[in-house]
């Protein structure tokens, strides 16, 4: 309302001021102020604007990760530092590219949601956040050439409209090999590609590929009596990137994005243990407005299946199905 009254005041004062000075020059100056300064800010009060939450709060992002992502000390640290550093860099050399790997239910999709919500008010529903699902948007191998053209046009058009666009590619392990290489020029160290800068855009890839390698490392630590929190990125990252690159069932199979080192971070999501499932269940109870009932928490967690068969250390579905299982106990 204060801004509205200020604009109205300028409009009411304009006739008398213009009479006292040069009508044309002052009129143009006033118009410039209204259109160049006030209008965009007034518009952004009622509609989402590109980069409207660019003053990303490190504390808010960390709180979202701490409160909602469990058993993923590596992912938390990488995401927090990479995203915060990138958004607060006025002149990045290239787009930020994150490749998130792990079994279903470990938090990959949830992290992409957290990132989107911390940058744009609309989160995944923002006009500046674009989600591609391999099996939905690129189903037919025979249409790869068409998909490549469409993908390039879509990204070019949206980055032209908003430099801070976010592109999320889900089910990379189900994407046809070679397709994702179409976006290679946009991820490289170019100031401009056909007159468009992609350096402030963000690309996030989600995949189950490489999950076996991540599990091997986590299981080795467990069998050695080491804490999972002792796992370092260097223990996994190189082996993970090689595994994904050589996986014929992955959209990254022999991809130039990996070969040219254009993926900034391969982010491993560790398989979840029994205690992490209980954390997920408690958060879901709270989100539904229920008091935490530890008996129900334990019963739901115990209904989940675990692997390896002998040791039963890790949940084979992560936290993905605990929410639906919780419905059984609250059928009112």
From Swiss-Prot:
Pfam families reported for this sequence: TOR1A_C, Torsin
User: Record's family?
Assistant: Belongs to the ClpA/ClpB family. Torsin subfamily.
Instruction: Give the UniProt record's GO annotations in the biological process aspect.
Output: cell adhesion; chaperone cofactor-dependent protein refolding; chaperone-mediated protein folding; ERAD pathway; intermediate filament cytoskeleton organization; neuron projection development; nuclear envelope organization; nuclear membrane organization
Q: Tell me how the protein is altered or processed after translation.
A: N-glycosylated.
* InterPro entries, per database record: P-loop_NTPase (IPR027417), TOR1A_C (IPR049337), Torsin (IPR010448), Torsin_1/2 (IPR017378)
Glyco sites are at: 143, 158
What coarse category fits the chief subcellular location reported for this protein?
Answer: endoplasmic reticulum
| Cysteine disulfide partners in this protein | none
Its membrane topology, per UniProt? Peripheral membrane protein
Outcome of swapping residue 33 to N: N-glycosylated
**Record localization:** Endoplasmic reticulum lumen; Nucleus membrane; Cell projection, Growth cone; Cytoplasmic vesicle membrane
Keywords assigned: ATP-binding, Cell projection, Chaperone, Cytoplasm, Cytoplasmic vesicle, Cytoskeleton, Disease variant, Dystonia, Endoplasmic reticulum, Glycoprotein, Hydrolase, Membrane, Nucleotide-binding, Nucleus, Signal, Synapse
**Associated disease:** Dystonia 1, torsion, autosomal dominant: A primary torsion dystonia, and the most common and severe form. Dystonia is defined by the presence of sustained involuntary muscle contractions, often leading to abnormal postures. Dystonia type 1 is characterized by involuntary, repetitive, sustained muscle contractions or postures involving one or more sites of the body, in the absence of other neurological symptoms. Arthrogryposis multiplex congenita 5: A form of arthrogryposis multiplex congenita, a developmental condition characterized by multiple joint contractures resulting from reduced or absent fetal movements. AMC5 is an autosomal recessive form characterized by severe congenital contractures, developmental delay, strabismus and tremor.
The protein, known as: Torsin-1A
> Which region ranges are annotated with the description Interaction with SYNE3?
312-332
The record's Gene Ontology cellular component field reads: cytoplasmic vesicle membrane; cytoskeleton; cytosol; endoplasmic reticulum; endoplasmic reticulum lumen; endoplasmic reticulum membrane; extracellular exosome; growth cone
Q: Signal sequence span per UniProt?
A: 1-20
Give the stretches traversing the membrane: none
* The species this protein was found in: Homo sapiens (Human)
